[in-house]
Design a protein with these regions (language model features):
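Structure-specific nucleic-acid interaction/processing domains
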Residues: 2-36, 40-117
Length: 117
């Protein structure tokens, strides 16, 4: 298979499935605190963390993490995918966002509030 055909295949697969939506946690390995969030595209969260690690900048991260990221560095944060939302083709963006908000709230309840940003 040539490169162009492979690229077309990958693009078609992406369009069929769309990005992976879900709930994640960024854990500060130095302080033990964590940030629980949700995203329509978990890949973008991974990319933002990688960018912050490579550049040493903190602006790619959530503003609640900036102080600790400046103090300990972005490399002190680990990404954990807590749950991937099964997105059905008939779901609207609003339904996906509502489901993500519910899942995020359920996951937040599992952690000690004093250890969550």
């Amino acid at each position: 298979m040539d490169q162009k055909a492979r690229r077309r295949e990958l693009v078609a697969e992406y369009r069929r499935t769309g990005p992976e939506a879900g709930v994640y946690r960024l854990v500060n390995t130095k302080s033990g605190r964590s940030f629980v969030g949700s995203a329509l595209n978990l890949g973008s969260v991974r990319s933002k963390l990688e960018f912050a690690r490579k550049t040493g900048g903190v602006s790619a991260l959530d503003h609640k993490l900036w102080a600790d990221a400046r103090q300990h560095g972005a490399e002190s944060f680990d990404l954990e995918i807590l749950e991937v939302l099964e997105v059905r083709p008939e779901m609207t963006q609003e339904e996906i966002r509502a489901d993500l908000a519910t899942l995020e709230a359920l996951w937040r309840e599992r952690y000690d509030p004093s250890q969550v940003y």
